[in-house]
């Protein structure tokens, strides 16, 4: 596993490509740490390795949500969503209020993807988040989960003058 820590990008990728079957705790922690690698290809391969892993690794992934790294948290949230790990919803909900907008955006996106109806109030509150990407994630979740949005919130969002928000609001009104 020293290769994952000290190897070249190519060596790390080659090793990660072979680890999508592992349930070894040390190896899983090492893979999760690669979600914060300097090289985007290494991060992508670590992501794929975790998503494709057929073992019950949700506890290791949930543990990764306690990282200090916003990259590890963000990518781990996306891995949990892609694996349909609904068991992680309570932990993901906590991160929807994180001070880092990237973490909030990924948490809201993961909750929406997991169809977390219990996060309805978080989605509605996040429609007026200070960060545009968080607002977009919340709006997509609201659309996907058929959550009713007040006219006042819609009017507030129209002021945004963002083409993606406008498209999403159009979808919302069609429902």
Indicate residue ranges for each PLM-predicted region.
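Structural detector for internal amphipathic alpha-helices that build alpha-solenoid repeat scaffolds
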Residues: 2-3, 9-24, 33, 41-55, ...
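Short inter-helical turns and helix N-cap capping residues of alpha-solenoid HEAT/ARM repeat scaffolds
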Residues: 7-8, 38-39, 68-69, 99-100, ...
């Amino acid at each position: 596993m020293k290769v994952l820590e000290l190897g070249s990008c190519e060596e790390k990728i080659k090793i990660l490509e072979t680890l999508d079957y592992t349930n070894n705790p040390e190896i899983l922690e090492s893979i999760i740490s690669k979600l914060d690698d300097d090289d985007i290809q290494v991060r992508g391969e670590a992501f794929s390795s975790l998503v494709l892993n057929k073992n019950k690794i949700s506890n290791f992934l949930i543990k990764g949500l306690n990282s200090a790294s916003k990259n590890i948290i963000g990518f781990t949230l996306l891995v949990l969503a892609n694996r349909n790990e609904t068991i992680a919803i309570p932990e993901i909900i906590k991160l929807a209020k994180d001070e880092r907008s990237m973490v909030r955006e990924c948490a809201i996106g993961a909750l929406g993807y997991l169809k977390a109806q219990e996060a309805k109030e978080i989605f509605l509150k996040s429609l007026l988040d200070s960060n545009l990407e968080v607002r977009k994630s919340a709006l997509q979740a609201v659309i996907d989960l058929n959550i009713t949005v007040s006219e006042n919130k819609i009017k507030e969002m129209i002021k945004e003058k963002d083409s993606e928000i406008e498209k999403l609001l159009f979808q919302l009104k069609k429902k």
